[in-house]
Design a protein with these regions (language model features):
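Short gly/ser/thr-rich secondary-structure transition/capping motifs
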Residues: 81-89, 138-142, 201-206, 301-307
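Polar low-complexity intrinsically disordered regions enriched in Ser/Thr and small residues
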Residues: 76, 84-85, 148, 180, ...
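Small-residue (G/A/S/T)-rich helix-start motifs and N-terminal tracts that mark the onset
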Residues: 1-65, 154-156, 163-304, 308-318, ...
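Nucleotide and nucleotide-moiety/phosphate-recognizing core
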Residues: 18-106, 114-134, 299
Length: 455
């Protein structure tokens, strides 16, 4: 990228920010805008964007929350007819009953998490007014997505160049609201966290060649279910029997095997496999299930009850805990995992020398080298009994089909979330219905136009 004139990046950012604010408001003319301005470049972005909005007919007031403000941006705002003050009580009288939008330019990506009391007071004063955050909501931990104190909760975050971890990782992702990315034309460093897009998934999904047969497409085995939880076996098999592998084998209690075969007549019994799925509904048999699967020397998806029996490094495996299960494995409180899931999943992947898929609002997949992918597909209705069993089976099928554990876990999670969106249609869903929608999601993803970024 050619060297840009001084201030060009800020002008690009401000232009994108102003356009996003105007779009949110349905136009700028006659609208009332308050800028909350800190001392850094985020404050400068807000001031320059405010100047652009003022020139388009908005009434713009800036509340300066630091002794210093971006001088050129402040001068531009005033030249365009905007006002600036350091006193909340001195804001424009026309703001009664309140502004149409508040622009959060308090702290940028280099700031420390948390907010000062004057910023908290300003946010409280404008409670209920839509908030647009500049780059990231002020006060969140940009690098980990954790929250360490007061922070902005935005309706819209306008970010520049690339998304940040805080936009994608809970709990900070919930504070970001809708995301709008402004391309600054930058040469970006390698990403520390990835969110797969449809073209990425399409490039990774296994496709049978013209000479394929059921064995070359992979055989996945499922060891799941017990007298207490027979349905877990049916759901794990449903996920595995999505068509992504050539064959599914079920090994378990004969009474459950009869139900599996009645529901899924394609499923066969014991034999050689390329991957195992172990643990869903396994109960007291989970330890034996895991040991026998590990003895085969093939990749294993370790879920649910089997997670309690992981007592050392398990290279080649994929662990699929939710926050409570991971907390028990790490011997910490669940709240600690939920407060910083990114650090927790990376710690787990290093500790057990394998891929770890941490299920949640935004599911995270980490490998022992520190790579992380986040899944942004799915709907809140996916928080339902049995959904994790389907996911375990789906990941197992992808492993059997030949994907590396990191790719199998992240692609499986993406497809699972997309299938849930289809199954939901805006309303409740069941885990069984998610499994039914997987082939359609795969078919539509493979057929969609666009480049294969990872292929």
């Amino acid at each position: 990228m050619a060297e840009l004139p001084d201030g060009a990046l800020m002008q690009r950012a401000a232009a994108g920010l102003a356009a996003a604010v105007a779009d949110l408001l349905g136009g700028a003319y006659g609208r009332r805008v308050v800028l909350l301005v800190g001392p850094g470049d985020n404050g400068g972005d807000a001031l320059w964007a405010g100047a652009r909005l003022a020139r388009r007919g908005a009434r713009v007031d800036a509340l300066l929350l630091a002794e210093q403000a971006h001088e050129a941006g402040l001068a531009a705002l005033r030249a365009a007819g905007g006002r600036a003050t350091r006193d909340l009580a001195d804001l424009h009288p026309d703001l009664h009953p309140g502004p149409d939008v508040v622009v959060d330019g308090i702290i940028g990506i280099g700031g420390r998490p948390g907010l000062r009391p004057d910023a908290v007071a300003a946010l409280d004063h404008f409670a209920g007014v839509p908030v647009v955050a500049v780059d990231v909501p002020s006060g969140v931990d940009v690098d980990t997505g954790s929250l360490h104190g007061p922070h902005v909760t935005a309706d819209l975050t306008v970010t520049f160049g690339t998304h940040k971890a805080a936009h994608l990782v809970d709990p900070a992702s919930r504070a970001s609201g809708a995301l709008h990315l402004v391309d600054l034309g930058l040469d970006l460093p390698p990403a520390t966290i990835e969110a797969l897009q449809p073209h990425d998934v399409r490039a990774l999904l296994p496709r049978p060649g013209s000479d394929a047969h059921k064995y070359t497409r992979g055989v996945v085995g499922v060891r799941a279910g017990s007298g207490t939880y027979p349905g877990a076996a049916l759901l794990a098999v449903a996920g595995a029997n999505s068509g992504l592998a050539g064959m599914v084998r079920y090994v378990g209690p004969e009474a459950i095997a009869d139900r599996v075969r009645a529901t899924h007549p394609e499923v066969v019994g014991a034999g050689r496999v390329q991957a195992w799925v172990v643990g869903p509904g396994g109960g007291d048999d989970a330890a034996r299930m895991l040991a026998e699967a590990r003895d085969d020397g093939v990749p294993v998806v370790v879920d649910a009850d089997a997670l309690r029996h992981v007592d050392g490094p398990v290279p080649g495996c994929v662990l699929t805990p939710h926050a409570g299960e991971l907390a028990a494995m790490l011997d910490v409180e669940r709240t600690e995992v939920e407060a910083c899931p990114l650090d927790s999943v990376r710690d787990a992947a290093r500790r057990w020398d394998c891929v770890v898929l941490l299920k949640g609002h935004h599911t995270l997949v980490a490998d022992p080298d520190g790579r992380v992918r986040v899944t942004t597909t799915g709907v809140p209705w996916l928080a339902t009994a049995g959904a994790g069993d389907v996911l375990a089976g789906l990941v197992g099928a992808l492993l059997a089909a030949g994907l590396e554990p990191y790719d199998a876990a992240s692609v499986g999670s993406w497809v699972h979330g997309a299938a849930a969106t289809e199954a939901s249609g805006g309303g409740p869903l069941t885990a069984s219905r998610v499994a039914v929608e997987v082939p359609r999601v795969v078919r539509e993803t493979l057929a969609a136009p666009g480049p294969g970024a990872l292929g």
